[in-house]
Amino acid sequence: MKLTVELIDEAMERADSLPIFENSHRQEQANLVGCIGEIVFERYLAHHQVTFKNDTISTRRDYVIGNSLALDVKTKDRTVRPQRHFDNSVPLYNHPHQRPDYYYFISLLREKSLGATDPRRFKEAYLMGGISLQDLDRVAKRWDAGQTDPSNGTTFWTACLNVQMDQLTPNDQLLETFRNA
């Protein structure tokens, strides 16, 4: 999905109204990235006529899909288009109390030449798919802060659970789950 000026402006307004969370590594920029992902996800659900309740004020989940399905959106920004072997992360500092039924992952493509704080650097959003909490806990690779993943050179700033793109439930299957929630 191409990111419009209108969407970025809406995300900036939403991000500006949020507090900086204690464990936030990127602070205001983390809020902006998260808000872009949330708006993209909301538009995706609306386009596919999936009912949802916005609960982003909570740190336990971002949305209630249908009548009961709790879901949290995780958004990562990248300088290259996402590929099937790339990872999606769930930080562990929220994991004890953030126990949604599903996590949903969005990747943002950013243009490096525009600078680290220019909100217009985000050009595209990729809706990657999701994973149930049970599957995440079963298949994810745990990384501790300071560890380096030898497959891609990433050194983790916080403990997290990682799943590869190909471990996610595809969007068409998730839409069916969401519609039946």
Q: What positions do the PLM features span?
A:
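Nucleic-acid endonuclease domains
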Residues: 1-66, 74-181
